[in-house]
Design a protein with these regions (language model features):
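Hydrophobic/aromatic-rich transmembrane helices and adjacent perimembrane loops
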Residues: 134-135, 141-144, 177, 186, ...
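Membrane-interface transmembrane helices that cradle and orient dolichyl/undecaprenyl
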Residues: 110-112, 116, 151-167, 177, ...
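Transmembrane-lumen/periplasm boundary regions of multi-pass, lipid-linked membrane glycan transferases
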Residues: 42, 48, 176, 188-305, ...
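Membrane-interface helix-loop-helix junctions at transmembrane boundaries of multi-pass membrane enzymes
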Residues: 4-9, 106, 110-111, 117, ...
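Signature aromatic-anchored transmembrane alpha helix within multi-pass, membrane-resident enzymes
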Residues: 14, 18, 218, 356-386
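Transmembrane-helix motifs of polytopic, lipid-linked glycan transferases
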Residues: 92-112, 150, 154
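Extracytosolic helix-loop segments that constitute the early lumenal/periplasmic catalytic or substrate-binding loops
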Residues: 22-28, 40-74, 78, 249
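Short periplasmic/luminal acceptor-recognition loop of GT-C membrane glycosyltransferases, typified by
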Residues: 408-444, 464-473
């Protein structure tokens, strides 16, 4: 009876943690994190599997099967077939797999240490920002983590029940984990170490479970191996194109170099649901318990297992898992991004859970400390993420459904080619007369003389629309973040300047300004009478100017005195023949309180030059709600970069929420030197329905 009672309490506590996990993962699911470029790539491959059975990548011009990380597409395809194609559906799929990983980790903790250890490990995962970010993102990481956790849990069950098919299930899950993401090979090393721990070398000479493990792994991963061997040339090319820098090296010098860089991954541990470095007591607790748990595991190994331990090798098993995974990732996982942290968090959470269980067991009469910690930690997690939701809700982020409505206003209906950031694939995938291509797929090639431009994927028979967003494609064109040479950027910019006209601009989206260009391959399209202005799902027209500031007027604005400015800073604001020159360090700038009508919408235009990264027009303030974006977000203010590219829209817009709105022109750069010569504010109003597609004069 006591055991039955304990099991029911354990299951009730686990159900409560599952509810807490859903609280941390379901709200604002399509709003935060912002759509990652990997998500639509993976969704498109799954969509192609659903349609044709082959994981092709049309947006990147890949007409044959993408042969790397093929498992995710085949996992997601039936889910899409059942529930539809969309960002919410894809992210919900990973949320459920993340819950599965939490439950499996709890099972491992319960079967190797104690129910308290299992619940504490589950709580640490369910409250971790990095793990939650992976669960809320439609990437391959969380499905791989789920199958890794399943492989480890199945092994533990097979060991305790002495049933070979559990080992077979463990091997099959390992194969699935590796099909989804190649990084999961680390779990195979851990399982081998566990097997040697339990059976020794003799266990390989006299098979017990490893033959089942191998058979299960070959059942799921074997067919893929056969395809790799048969199509090695294609696989080799795709590795070179997409993952050449991520292949593990085997030279000791390279391994040591990679290990020295591993600290970069841990610096980004916080990144996930919480997307910026802010005080995070949950993370501090997790880190502390992990460190304490590693030490206590070593101590427990030295003094021997406790009398009540369900697994005599439990401490050694968890230490191998936590430390072994960390060592493998340090030396052999070259990409040091924090999105791979959930793999490591399996072992870290179990080490932390062991610490909670061990400490509560070592204190006579305080066995309640373990369950109390789990309850308190869960409540603290709910409160913390409620606060984060509130804070992030004041940012520029909006649900993707809002972005979808904006994109449909920007792009004309009918047959067309759309070149844009991969994030926008979800909007256009179902349009039969639209060919959506990632900007990275093509490079305009000037035919010279009378020959038209060649643009991969496009012909002169249909309109060409470019959707250049401020946060992804524009930085690529300005700085070449992912392209190895400047020719790609120069050719795209030249194409935009010579063969395109700006047809519409969406202001205040979750992706900054999105500019819609109408382009042709030969010559230049006819200029429009104006540019349409879009905010959210509404088009706007300019009514009249309400404020016009020349350089002389700007020179009379109040000089900005930033509270962070050190006494050694040398900010400068001076009126010159070209305008007001803002230079120096210490956040130099000028500000003015603009008299606004709450609820009205305004467009802000600046004339500036020599601007660089960090030079901003800040509308509103974070201290009090004064503005919102045209999409209804950014209630904590709109810190808008002063765009240097002349071919890209430079206006900003806002909805006034207060009778006075602060307008601040300044720089966050370590040092700056730019000129602003004028600033104009114009009132906007929704365009009448009959002229909703009419252009707005500039």
């Amino acid at each position: 009876m006591p055991k039955m009672f304990e099991r029911r309490v354990y299951l009730l506590a686990l159900a409560a943690l599952a509810l807490v996990y859903f609280h941390n993962t379901i709200p604002h699911l399509t709003m935060m994190p912002r759509v990652n470029v990997d998500e639509p790539w993976l969704m498109e491959r799954a969509y192609q599997v659903m349609r044709t059975g082959i994981p092709t990548q049309p947006m990147l011009g890949l007409k044959t099967a993408y042969l790397l990380q093929v498992g995710y597409g085949y996992l997601l395809a039936p889910w899409m077939a059942a529930f539809g194609v969309g960002l919410f559906q894809a992210r919900l799929f990973n949320v459920l797999l993340g819950l599965g990983a939490v439950l499996l980790v709890s099972s491992i903790g319960r079967r190797t240490v104690s129910p308290t250890a299992g619940l504490a490990a589950a709580a640490l995962l369910a409250m971790d920002s990095n793990f939650l970010g992976g669960a809320r993102n439609a990437r391959t990481d969380m499905p791989s983590v789920f199958f890794v956790a399943a492989a480890l849990a199945a092994y533990v069950v097979g060991l305790q029940r002495e049933r070979g098919w559990w080992f077979g299930l463990s091997g099959a899950c390992l194969g699935l984990a590796m099909l989804v993401h190649g990084n999961a090979f680390w779990a195979g090393v851990i399982l081998l170490a566990w097997y040697l721990l339990d059976y020794g070398v003799a266990g390989i000479v006299r098979p017990r479970g490893y033959n089942w493990l191998a058979a299960g792994w070959l059942a799921t991963f074997g067919p893929y191996l056969a395809v790799v061997v048969a199509r090695w040339q294609d696989v080799h090319v795709q590795i070179g194109n997409f993952a050449g820098d991520r292949v593990p090296a085997w030279r000791p010098s390279v391994i040591l170099h990679q290990a020295a860089l591993e600290i970069d991954r841990y610096r980004g541990w916080y990144f996930g649901l919480v997307t910026k470095s802010v005080p995070n007591p949950l993370l501090w607790t997790f880190r502390s318990l992990t460190a304490i748990g590693i030490v206590l595991l070593a101590v427990r190994i030295a003094i021997g297992p406790s009398r009540t331990a369900p697994d005599r090798n439990g401490a050694a098993r968890l230490l191998i898992l936590a430390a072994g995974a960390a060592l493998i990732f340090a030396g052999f996982i070259n990409n040091k991004v924090p999105v791979y942290m959930p793999h490591l968090l399996i072992g870290f959470a179990l080490a932390g859970g062991f610490a909670v269980s061990e400490i509560s067991a070592l204190l006579p009469g305080f066995a309640w400390l373990g369950p109390a910690f789990v309850a308190f930690y869960a409540i603290a997690g709910v409160a913390y993420y409620e606060k984060w939701y509130s804070s992030a809700g004041k940012s520029e982020l909006v649900p993707y459904e809002s972005t979808d409505a904006t994109l449909r206003l920007l792009a004309p209906s009918g047959p067309k080619y759309v070149y844009a950031s991969p994030q926008f694939w979800t909007t256009f995938y179902g349009d039969a007369d639209t060919d959506f291509l990632s900007y990275a797929e093509a490079q305009p090639v000037d035919g010279g003389g009378e020959h038209p431009v060649t643009l991969a994927g496009a012909t002169s028979g249909r309109p060409i629309v470019l959707l250049v967003d401020e946060l992804q494609w524009l930085p690529e064109l300005a700085a070449g973040i992912s392209q190895p040479t400047t020719s790609w950027q120069k050719d795209w910019v030249s194409f935009i300047e010579s063969h395109c006209v700006l047809e519409a601009e969406a202001l205040g989206t979750a992706h900054g300004t999105i500019a819609a260009y109408s382009c042709v391959l030969d010559g230049r399209p006819q200029p429009t009478s104006g540019v349409r202005i879009v905010g959210g799902a509404t088009e706007f027209t300019v009514v009249r100017p309400v404020l016009s500031q020349t350089a002389d007027d700007l020179a009379r604005w109040t000089k900005y005195d930033d509270p962070r400015r050190p006494s050694t800073a040398r900010p400068s604001v001076a009126l010159t023949a070209d305008g007001v020159r803002i230079s120096g360090d210490g956040w130099p700038g000028i500000l003015k309180m603009f008299d606004a009508t709450p609820g009205d919408r305004y467009l802000v235009r600046t004339q500036d030059s020599m601007t660089h990264d960090g030079d901003l027009l800040y509308l509103g303030t974070w201290q009090q709600p004064q503005v919102r974006s045209l999409s209804g977000a950014s209630s904590s203010g709109i810190p808008a970069p002063l765009i240097a590219q002349r071919w890209f829209p430079r206006e900003r817009a806002f909805i006034a929420d207060a009778p006075q709105v602060r307008m601040l022109v300044y720089s966050e750069a370590p040092s700056t030197d730019f000129v602003i010569s004028s600033l104009d504010v114009l009132r906007l109003q929704p365009a009448p329905a009959r002229t909703a597609r009419a252009a707005v004069g500039r």
